[in-house]
Regions:
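N-terminal Sec-pathway targeting helices
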Residues: 1-10
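Compact, glycine-rich, soluble single-domain proteins
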Residues: 15-159
């Protein structure tokens, strides 16, 4: 057991260093996410869809351009669970919404701040307290701009 803890720490720090010092050609490589449309209450939202494990892991990392208030990214999971988002290498603040399988908003965070220190993930990891199947993320101000409330409903149109 005493050997496993230092080995795990070394592995963790090597992984962090790899992400931080990733070459620009990998960082800046655009991902071609599928596009679709959702509706939240009465607002029709254009979305980029992150559905595979690789897409959900890379999602908005190293992306400089922010979303407009009528666009977002939706992370789609195979089943409901307590999914967390680590805002490592995210360039701007986000509004984050978790929706259950029925499309009901179960949790949200306004103005989530990205990591300032990648060695302290506790200050930039956001997790729902209720199982969710979908996470919708957009630029800060999305919640207010689209009048999202605790009773908001997500309706997938084409995802």
């Amino acid at each position: 057991m005493a050997v496993l803890i230092p080995a795990a720490l070394v592995t963790f720090f090597i992984g962090i260093a790899g992400i931080i010092f990733m070459p620009d050609e990998i960082k800046n490589k655009p991902l071609d996410f599928d596009r679709g449309t959702i509706k939240i209450d009465h607002s029709v939202i254009d979305v980029e869809i992150a559905e595979s494990d690789a897409e959900r892991q890379r999602w908005l990392m190293f992306r400089n351009e922010e979303f407009s208030l009528n666009s977002a990214m939706i992370l789609v999971y195979p089943k409901s669970d307590l999914y967390a988002l680590w805002l490592l290498n995210i360039q701007y603040n986000l509004d984050i919404m978790w929706f259950n399988e029925e499309g009901k908003l179960v949790y949200y965070i306004k103005d989530a701040k990205p990591c300032e220190n990648p060695l302290d993930p506790h200050n930039c990891t956001y997790k729902t307290t209720v199982p969710a199947k979908y996470i919708v993320v957009s630029t800060e101000g999305f919640l207010k701009g689209n009048n999202i409330t605790n009773s908001s409903i997500l309706t997938p149109i084409s995802i």
